[in-house]
Every structure is written in C-alpha cells, then in structure tokens.
Amino acid sequence: MRNSAMQQLNPSEISALIKQRIGDLDTSATAKNEGTIVMVSDGIVRIHGLADAMYGEMIEFDGGLFGMALNLEQDSVGAVVLGNYLSLQEGQKARCTGRVLEVPVGPELLGRVVDALGNPIDGKGPIDAKLTDAVEKVAPGVIWRQSVDEPVQTGYKSVDTMIPVGRGQRELIIGDRQTGKTAMAIDAIIAQKHSGIKCVYVAIGQKQSTIANVVRKLEETGAMAYTTVVAAAAADPAAMQYLAPYSGCTMGEYFRDRGEDALIIYDDLSKQAVAYRQISLLLRRPPGREAYPGDVFYLHSRLLERASRVSADYVEKFTNGAVTGQTGSLTALPIIETQAGDVSAFVPTNVISITDGQIFLETSLFNAGIRPAVNAGISVSRVGGSAQTKIIKKLSGGIRTALAQYRELAAFAQFASDLDEATRKQLEHGQRVTELMKQKQYAPYSIADQAVSVYASNEGYMADVEVKKIVDFDAALISYFRSEYAPLMKQIDETGDYNKDIEAAIKSGIESFKATQTY
C-alpha cells in the first residue's frame, strides 16, 4: 500500500510543491523593537520602525542616551531626546525599552537639587533612593478624595487672613514679571519649618543664577532640610522643561500617598507651556490659539489634578495597611507670568479655571511699596475658608471688609472735597489696614503673630498710630508679645483656638504694650 502511494507522486509534482512553498514564504523584515533614526533636529528625532512603541515609552539610543516617544505615526515614531542630542546621527539604531519614564522618590531627595530626571546636580554625590515611580500618573479618583479642612500657613498676613490656602488645594499665584511671585512661594516654603510639610520647588526655564540664589536662601533659613529642588534651567532642553513639573509632582506624591503632607511650587507653568509648544511644533502637530497645541489645557489639568487631599482609606490601601487613620495631601502653588497684566490670555485663563483660587500680584501695587503686592479685590480662595484656623477665621473677616470699603470709598474721595466724619474714619482705617498687610521678605508671621496684629487693627488700637508708623508699631507689638506672653503665643500657635480667655489675654497684652510705648 505504502509503495503504491510513493509511486503516484512524480518528481515534477515534488518540485512544484517546493516552489510553491518558497513562493509563499514571507521574507519581508518587520522592525518591531528596533528602528533606525531618519532625522535629528532641535532635540527631536524621527525613527523609522519601532512598530511596538507605546506613547510615552522610553526609547534607548546608542551611547546610553534616552528619548521619549510622543508621536506614533504609521511607519515612524517622533521622540524627544532627554539630554544632549548632538551625538545622535541619522542611520543609528533606536530600541524600545518597554518602560515608561521613572524618577527616584523618597526622603533621600530632601535637601538635594536634581534635574527633571532625578539626577543630582548639586555636587553632593549620588542620591541613594530606594524607590522610583512613574513621572506620568493618573490623579486619585473622586472616591479617594477628602474635603480640604486643614490650613497651609504661608506666613503672609494678607494671604492667610483673606486668601487662605488649605492642604490639598491648588492656589494660583499670578502676576507680571518682577511682582514678587517667586518671593511669595519661597516664603511659603520657609514658613513650613515647624509644620512638618515637605516641600518641592520646581524651577522651569529660569536662569541658573536665579535658581542658585533660591537654593542659597533656602539653605540659609534651614528650609532645605525638608525641601527638594527640581531644576530645568533656561539652558536645558525643552523636553526637560516640559517634564520637570511631572517629575516634581511624583516626588511630592510619595509623601501624600503615605499619609504625610507636601507642598509643591511650579515656578512657572507659563514657561512649561512654551517648552511644550516648542516640542509640539517641532513634532509637526497643528498649532491652535497663540500657536499652542490643542492639548495645552490637558498639559496643565493632568498635572494640577494630582494635587489633592486623599482619604485615610486611600493611604491605608496604598501602604497595604502599614499606615492607618492618616490622610495625605499634596498642595500646589502654580505660578503664571502674565504680559502687561493680561489675565485673559490663553494659558492664564486655562490655569485659573483649573485651580481652586488665585492670588493676583499687581505691578502698580508693587511699585507703590505695597509688598506683597496682593490685589485683595480680585484674589480669591475657593476652598481655603473651611481650612482656616479658628482664631484667624474669627478675626480676619474685618480685614477683607475694611479693604473692600476702603477701595470703594477711595474712588469717591478723589472727587469729593468735604467728607463726613464716618467716611473719613473708614478711609483712615483702610489706609492703616493696607499698611498693616505690608511685610518684609523672609519674615513669615506665625498664627499667633497674625492673630495679635489683626485683633489690634480690628479693635481700633492702631487708630491713633500714624499711618507711616504702622509697620514699626506692628513689629514692636509682636516682639513684645513674644517676650512677655510666650505661653499664650505658644498656645495659639499649637491649637489655633479662640475663646473669651484668649481674647481677654490679647486685649490686656495690647493695652499694657500701648501703656509703655508711644507711637
């Protein structure tokens, strides 16, 4: 039977079968995990192949250089180079790594200055971080969040009384150049010395000398002990300036997710948007309003949504039960620079709509010597009110009202020659409150300091003090209370409570101060 089957298959059929098999064989090469660089320009590379690349995946080049895939096209991939792209050439190989960008996280980064990839740039040796985490992460969902009800003291009387910031809030600092935006952010970090809040300062597109000055000031005040500085200077590639805020956010989230509180400052997001616009245009993405790409809103919303107050359940789940009954928070103070006070430009309006309030700093106020140059009329905190300490909440109502009435009356007073007694008193009180809100840089006020100042103003103890002497009077009053009423000040700082006994103690303290001092 077997022999007869062999006889039926003649040699010509065998050769035809073999030819058919050879013809059907697919010999075309498909580049899956390796590709070839076909174009290099301005920190952007176009790679032919890499069919398996993911969006945001790390791409490895020859010489240990890495890139990040941002454009996935039919037969090529557009990537930004994370580092010096001048060593790359057309024809070189590029490989998928299967990993997304990660940066080191943990307490080891406190006191250090790092770049957008978490590499130390302060000359203090390597960072021995035990953990790394993804730069791009999804923000906690609604179910895991908790309402903001604890304060972040910025140390500024004008902010803590009228525009309070809570833990887990996003409060925008917006203003023209040279209006004190960075100074306010640095003071907010210095004010956290005794609060236990860890800080991250992200410098985007700034001069290296400016960043060095900030670091020096933080070291002088002892604030560097609980602060990490992430620096993407003006001379760094656009890709680094684009990534720096996300890297800093991941470093801050390490503390939030473990039931601690953190504060992050993005200085400033206008420059990040410009860097992202540059990358997008080089990647040939279609431009939109002001030449920004269509997803510039998403650029900032996905970053700022990661700042949140998370519930104890979230922390417990994240730490696998290691931390219980602790909520965590990441508070964001993004900074936006406006051009000639134009807050209706594209990026400012985007960030205003994403954040929970804004602090407007004005050039005219700054030049008039009112520093911090906060415009209390259009500055607002949408959630901070519920986070204020009891004593500040109780006392600060009069400040906002006095300033609002003063602004309204000051406009009328320009045209009216004779003013009645009540109006004149309101104007004078408004002038004194405006003067009281002035504050020197690097001199944060504690809760107790603010309470004493505001109480003295509200109850008319400054009515007989000359306007130009208000600042000196206030400084002397605080100094007197710190030396003569130290236990009371300590109690207010620790509890934030306000009752009849505390009010009586503050009142008698101010009266005894006024009896000994003449202003």
UniProtKB/Swiss-Prot annotation:
GO terms for molecular function: ADP binding; ATP binding; proton-transporting ATP synthase activity, rotational mechanism. Coiled coil: none annotated. Its EC number is 7.1.2.2. F-type ATPases have 2 components, CF(1) - the catalytic core - and CF(0) - the membrane proton channel. CF(1) has five subunits: alpha(3), beta(3), gamma(1), delta(1), epsilon(1). CF(0) has three main subunits: a(1), b(2) and c(9-12). The alpha and beta chains form an alternating ring which encloses part of the gamma chain. CF(1) is attached to CF(0) by a central stalk formed by the gamma and epsilon chains, while a peripheral stalk is formed by the delta and b chains. Belongs to the ATPase alpha/beta chains family. HAMAP family: ATP_synth_alpha_bact. This is ATP synthase subunit alpha. It comes from Acinetobacter baylyi (strain ATCC 33305 / BD413 / ADP1).
